[in-house]
């Protein structure tokens, strides 16, 4: 938390997704920290100490999102981590999300109400 607002780290290589998340989050009184790759996401994670993490499953490499989450486990992450996944993403259907260390999954296109209600519940 920073200045009384929750910090949300969003990692996705799609600028349109990042821009959409920024509009939604900032208009609902959250601070958004962005990253466009898993590597950049790790740097932003350690610098910002986020309260909640949203990471795309498929980024610059097929399992960049998974590798990022594993790195957070090594860092003893306590923030809820939600993976972004495309509807019908065959890789997503083959992953045990809880075993990977994820709190949950958001399907693309992202439903604003689902995002905001999840944040409200998980950040109590």
Report the location of each language-model feature.
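The short loop immediately C-terminal to the conserved phospho-acceptor aspartate in CheY-like receiver
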Residues: 14, 58-60
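Alpha4 helix (beta4-alpha4-beta5 surface) of REC/receiver domains from two-component response regulators
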Residues: 63-67, 74, 88-106, 113, ...
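Non-catalytic signal-transmission and effector/linker regions of two-component phosphorelay proteins
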Residues: 1-7, 111-124
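Helix N-cap/capping motif at the beta->alpha junctions
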Residues: 34-43, 64-65
């Amino acid at each position: 938390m920073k200045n009384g607002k929750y910090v949300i780290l969003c990692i996705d290589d799609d600028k349109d997704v990042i821009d959409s998340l920024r509009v939604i989050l900032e208009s609902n009184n959250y601070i958004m920290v962005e990253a466009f790759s898993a590597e950049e996401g790790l740097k932003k994670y350690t610098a910002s100490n986020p309260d909640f993490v949203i990471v795309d499953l498929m980024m610059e490499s097929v399992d960049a999102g998974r590798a990022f989450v594993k790195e957070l486990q090594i860092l003893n992450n306590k923030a809820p981590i939600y993976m972004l996944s495309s509807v019908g993403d065959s890789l997503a259907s083959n992953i045990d999300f809880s075993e990977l260390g994820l709190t949950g999954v958001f399907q693309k296109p992202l439903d604003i109400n689902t995002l905001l209600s999840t944040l409200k519940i998980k950040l109590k």
